[in-house]
């Protein structure tokens, strides 16, 4: 039995001299036989898989076949999965393949026997042990196997990639599964004498083209660089362990120590690398995420795949079903007991008709719908005008404006637009990276984006989605045969206004304490949509102030203006009675066990209740709900007045409110409760309003306390924000206990206000008292003294009134 040699474990040293030099000649002791004996004594396996050593007899020959498996170029090479997926890579299939290459029918080696195969999948090859037939020598068998393998593997059309080569193994190969990946360079170590470069070339050239040989006499090694991986792999597996001139050759792959090119580039060229990385990330984001975002925005507008009643296909089914049932009922003379719930008074019906007509005209559909808070602008547009339209996008500015953090703002904006996916946390990370890059390079990377820019990008993506929806059925060419008509996109949109989406922007204003840029961005975006004729845009606003902002975004254009006012008493009465006459079976929160009896007395009570309620849409709807739930009209009115008064006290008269604004609100309550309206010129001379009357009133109007009329931009009259507030003002004044508390709070605020004024004047008097010539400021001193006397008298009056109120 021939046992291949393993790595020497011990050396016995002998010393000789030659030409005056000391030469070390190691006396070698092989350890493989001892290891084999130990394994046999322990009853362990001696296979090549367990020991890394291939055993063969003198009657056997060992051949290495290359390019049988896909070789591993890295630790995570995906080509290795090919061995698991393909059936022709199994052990039996490989044995049959190798035997076919070595012993083909057209040039057989008689009585050739394949004893064993040992796959080396990392190197892509197989060690095969053949039994040499008696009529052949080992050299003859090796030569024939090499020739047959070369001829058989080259018959395939893909032989350039799949050709297999066979080489006799001259050494004692070491079968290891260490993490030493193949490379095109091998390190040859000599245990004993050092071969010449010519001898090394002659020994290793047969396995592949050698690019260069790098000798290292000090370490007794050669570095051989092959042109291909195959040459280095075959040389390593066939020559390693070979003995030449009493020198044992050890061959290992040389691991190429390549520098980290990418990391070095980033470290050494940050000013170029960082912008380049940002550009690549931006391109990747556009390629991957923008199509997804455009699709989600289209879904938000059309509801085509949404799981709701707005689903496109569900609407089609319901439309067909409803039409069919209506036809059947009409044929049998059956009428619906349910009255259509979309009740409007005549003025509102005309508004709805005008809006629908403007959307059909397709001529600069830029509508501004103005009305006080609670006038029903949202209901008029969304429920009565656009309820049957399949492509509507609703944006609520209030949710965007009130977002306190950048991440919350971006999430709210994305939610309203249907912009998905979005990564708000990236903004915080990029800010930190921007600071780090600025510290390294001295300049900003431009990685971080402001929320204004991100919001603008969202709107740009939404514009692309809107364009896709508007041009869904567009065909550039119409006709067949000789009659072909080219149709432009502009002409198609002009002829099909129903294809264009409707953008509804609610609670639009022109300024805000935070996130005020939203109004400007939405205004510019809407103007661009209208100019490109891609969509109809409807703005819902409470005041006339946004008109200037819209005019800046869309100059030289006349807006379609529509104003919603409170209903007249006649229209409000008709609306309420029509609502009360409806069957309430579909209302889950209303008790229908007690049907309403609309007798003359009941109608008279409703008429009396509608006087203080007025014609505000939301108040009328609240009144109807209360009456339907079982409350009497008078009781419903009282509760609504109490609720309105509570709202006023909590927002404007509570301790958390601004003291000055609270005092101004109470003064207006007393004036408006007596007259119903007051002129602006009667307010500007009052002490609380004298400093900035218009700013104070605008702030109260913004918070929904009062509403004002203007004549050519100048304030003229002041009214309560809604008619119900008049009754609430009267309630606050007539309730003695509440009146005493609120009046006392107002008087104390007046005392504080007048005291602050006196302190300011006293400081001026103190400064004037230091002047030597008092005659120069005699008139100013008299003026200040008069002011102080007047304020002191006002304080005395307030304090005396507080005492009187405390006694009640």
From Swiss-Prot:
The record's section on Pfam families has: RNA12 (PF10443)
Mitochondrial intermembrane-side segments: 293-808
The keyword Membrane is assigned to this record: yes
A single Gene Ontology MF term assigned here is: RNA binding
Any one GO biological process: mitochondrial genome maintenance
Q: Which residues form a coiled coil?
A: none
Boundaries of each RRM domain copy?
184-256
Q: Which residue stretches are annotated as topological domain Mitochondrial matrix? A: 31-271
Location(s), subcellular? Mitochondrion inner membrane
According to the record, the segments passing through the membrane are 272-292
Provide the transit peptide span: 1-30
Q: Which UniProt keywords apply?
A: Membrane, Mitochondrion, Mitochondrion inner membrane, mRNA processing, RNA-binding, Transit peptide, Transmembrane, Transmembrane helix
Q: This chain belongs to which protein, by name?
A: Mitochondrial escape protein 2
Lineage at the top is: Eukaryota, Fungi, Dikarya, Ascomycota, Saccharomycotina
């Amino acid at each position: 039995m021939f046992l291949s040699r393993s790595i020497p474990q011990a050396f016995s040293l002998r010393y000789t001299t030659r030409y005056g030099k000391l030469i070390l000649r190691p006396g070698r002791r092989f350890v493989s036989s001892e290891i084999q004996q130990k394994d046999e004594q322990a009853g362990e396996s001696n296979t090549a898989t367990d020991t890394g050593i291939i055993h063969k007899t003198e009657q056997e020959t060992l051949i290495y076949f290359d390019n049988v498996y896909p070789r591993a170029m890295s630790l995570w090479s995906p080509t290795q999965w090919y061995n698991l997926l393909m059936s022709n890579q199994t052990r039996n299939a490989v044995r049959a393949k190798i035997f076919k290459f070595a012993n083909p029918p057209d040039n057989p080696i008689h009585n050739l026997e394949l004893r064993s195969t040992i796959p080396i999948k990392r190197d892509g090859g197989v060690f095969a042990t053949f039994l040499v037939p008696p009529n052949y020598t080992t050299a003859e068998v090796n030569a024939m196997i090499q020739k047959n393998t070369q001829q058989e593997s080259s018959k395939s059309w893909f032989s350039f990639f799949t050709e297999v080569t066979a080489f006799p193994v001259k050494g004692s190969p070491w079968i290891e599964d260490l993490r030493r990946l193949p490379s095109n360079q091998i390190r040859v170590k000599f245990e004993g004498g050092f071969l010449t470069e010519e001898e090394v070339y002659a020994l290793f050239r047969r396995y592949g083209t050698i690019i260069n040989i790098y000798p290292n006499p000090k370490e007794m090694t050669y570095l051989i660089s092959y042109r291909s991986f195959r040459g280095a792999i075959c040389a390593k597996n066939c020559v390693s362990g070979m003995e030449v001139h009493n020198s044992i050759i050890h061959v290992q792959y040389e691991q190429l120590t390549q520098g980290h090119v990418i990391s070095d580039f980033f470290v050494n060229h940050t000013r170029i690398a960082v912008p380049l990385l940002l550009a690549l990330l931006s391109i990747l984001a556009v390629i991957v995420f923008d199509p997804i975002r455009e699709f989600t925005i289209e879904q938000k507008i059309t509801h085509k795949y949404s799981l709701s009643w707005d689903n496109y296909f569900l609407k089609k089914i319901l439309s067909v079903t409803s039409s069919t049932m209506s036809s059947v009922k009409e044929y049998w003379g059956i009428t619906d007991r349910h009255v259509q719930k979309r009740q409007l008074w005549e003025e509102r019906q005309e508004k709805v008709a005008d809006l629908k007509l403007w959307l059909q005209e397709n001529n600069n559909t830029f509508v501004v719908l103005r009305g006080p808070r609670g006038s029903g602008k949202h209901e008029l547009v969304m429920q009565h005008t656009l309820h049957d339209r399949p492509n509507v996008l609703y944006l609520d500015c209030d949710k965007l404006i009130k977002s306190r953090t950048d991440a919350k703002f971006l999430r709210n904006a994305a939610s309203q637009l249907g912009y998905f996916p979005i990564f708000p946390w990236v903004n915080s990370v990029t800010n930190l990276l921007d600071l780090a890059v600025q510290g390294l390079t001295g300049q900003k990377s431009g990685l971080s984006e402001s929320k204004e820019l991100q919001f603008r990008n969202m709107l740009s993506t939404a514009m692309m989605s809107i364009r896709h929806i508007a041009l869904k059925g567009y065909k550039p060419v119409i006709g067949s045969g000789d009659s072909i008509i080219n149709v432009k996109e502009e002409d198609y949109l002009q002829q099909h206004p129903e294809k264009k989406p409707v953008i509804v922007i609610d609670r639009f204003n022109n300024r805000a304490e935070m996130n005020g840029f939203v109004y400007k961005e939405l205004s510019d975006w809407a103007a661009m949509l209208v100019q490109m004729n891609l969509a109809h845009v409807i703005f819902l606003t409470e005041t006339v102030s946004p008109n200037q902002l819209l005019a800046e975004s869309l100059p030289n254009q006349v807006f379609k203006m529509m104003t919603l006012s409170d209903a007249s008493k006649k229209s409000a009465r008709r609306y309420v009675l029509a609502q009360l006459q409806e069957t309430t079976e579909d209302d889950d929160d209303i008790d229908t066990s007690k049907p309403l009896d609309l007798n003359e007395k009941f109608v008279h009570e409703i008429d009396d209740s509608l006087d203080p309620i007025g014609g505000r849409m939301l108040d009328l709807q609240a009144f109807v709900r209360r009456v339907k739930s079982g409350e009497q009209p008078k009781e419903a009115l009282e509760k609504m007045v109490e609720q309105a008064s509570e709202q006023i006290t909590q927002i404007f008269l509570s301790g958390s409110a601004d003291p000055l604004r609270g005092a101004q609100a109470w003064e207006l309550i007393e004036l408006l409760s007596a007259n119903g309206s007051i002129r602006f010129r009667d307010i500007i001379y009052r002490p609380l309003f004298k400093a900035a009357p218009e700013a104070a009133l605008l702030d109260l109007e913004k918070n929904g306390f009062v509403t004002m009329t203007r004549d050519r931009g100048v304030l003229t009259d002041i009214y309560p924000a809604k008619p119900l507030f008049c009754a609430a003002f009267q309630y606050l004044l007539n309730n003695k206990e509440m009146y005493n508390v609120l009046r006392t709070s107002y008087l104390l605020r007046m005392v504080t206000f007048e005291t602050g004024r006196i302190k300011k004047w006293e400081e001026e008097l103190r400064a004037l008292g230091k002047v030597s010539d008092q005659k120069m400021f005699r008139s100013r001193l008299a003026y200040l003294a008069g002011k102080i006397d007047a304020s002191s008298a006002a304080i005395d009056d307030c304090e005396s009134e507080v005492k009187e109120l405390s006694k009640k």
